[in-house]
């Protein structure tokens, strides 16, 4: 039986808090389920909605001025959401509403509200790079990698982009400046800060509070546009979340990383924004080119990639004094693949203190073998490398999440060999190890190469798990 609680049965303060929040006397079940949420509920109840409405209006004026929404519509949407619980009787939905309202109440002002106040002066920190001098070299390197054969019948899984991306980009530029200790960017926008001729779409970010930020941003978009906004979590991408609108159009995504990972990511400071060091990004690009769909992207628009490649090459030339004279020494390092066990052995003794690297193509197998080694010194850099690294008895153990290209039966393609070398160099950069000679040889090994056809490729590791999502309109959280 769903009876109302007796006023003398429950502590008056807790009951009053819940009753005020729900706008009704709670049932016995509601009281017992919600009483542990009394502190959060009280914060929501006393929250100054007028100040919050003012902040959202200011965010709208600054970043979404072209969206046709009136101030009264914004206020009505906000007040409607903060009273939604009064018309909700499902306990699960009430918990979702409380959780999401709590995020807004406790974090919105510091995360997005702060963007409406006067910003600190921008510290101009740009260096003039001669990117043009690297364009021909970049084109030559990419041309030798342009070996994918496009299957025209294959449907590519690229996302549709929301018209709000330009508004969110404008907000993100300011967000990156205000929150540069917890949020950094990489990808085309970060290279645009070095070379204004770079074209970019959405802004790629790594941050330490991704979930909270995306919830706050989703609500800001909802209150301004009135659209239902959904946050999705993809199981095969570590700590990744994306905001989409009700038509499944992509607005922004983010990878979450720990603060200790953020601290070791190599980065540079440009106009009050931290970007991932372009050297690191160049290595990651070389690594990702072993992924067959990335090579297909290259074949579709080589000039887009050429501008990015030339920018990164000029950065490493200027920063590290790399000389592009074709001196490759022992690069790429020798790679032997065991296709049955899905392990690639890379000979590293010419460059590093560990004599070889065992690269596992199945993450669960690596985890099991690390346990058998009884070693506790592994490094997990989360989505920054998508891999754990361990050095034990002069052998590096690591996981590689991409496909391995073969140029012949049992022979690792040089594109993948360089990708594996780059993967090892990412570890060296993250741990402040030596990498510059190896980097120089790796880049020089990409010069004056002929195209080598792809014979076949290994499949990527299959990641288990289910998709998670937060549906604001339907009050559902599934993670």
Curated annotation (Swiss-Prot):
Q: Does the keyword Calcium apply?
A: yes
Its biological purpose is as follows: Polymerase that creates the 3'-poly(A) tail of mRNA's.
Q: Which GO terms describe its biological process?
A: mRNA processing
- Active site residues according to the UniProt entry: 202, 204
Q: Which residues does the annotation say bind Ca(2+) 2?
A: 202, 204, 253
Q: What Pfam families has UniProt attached to this entry?
A: Pox_polyA_pol, Pox_polyA_pol_C, Pox_polyA_pol_N
Reactions catalysed, semicolon-separated, are: RNA(n) + ATP = RNA(n)-3'-adenine ribonucleotide + diphosphate
Species, as recorded: Vaccinia virus (strain Tian Tan)
Q: Which residues bind Ca(2+) 1?
A: 202, 204
GO MF terms, alphabetically ordered:
ATP binding; metal ion binding; poly(A) RNA polymerase activity
User: What switches on its expression?
Assistant: Expressed in the early phase of the viral replicative cycle.
Q: How does it assemble?
A: Heterodimer of a large (catalytic) subunit and a small (regulatory) subunit.
Name of the protein described by the UniProt record = Poly(A) polymerase catalytic subunit
What EC number(s) does the entry state? 2.7.7.19
Q: Does the record carry ATP-binding as a key word? A: yes
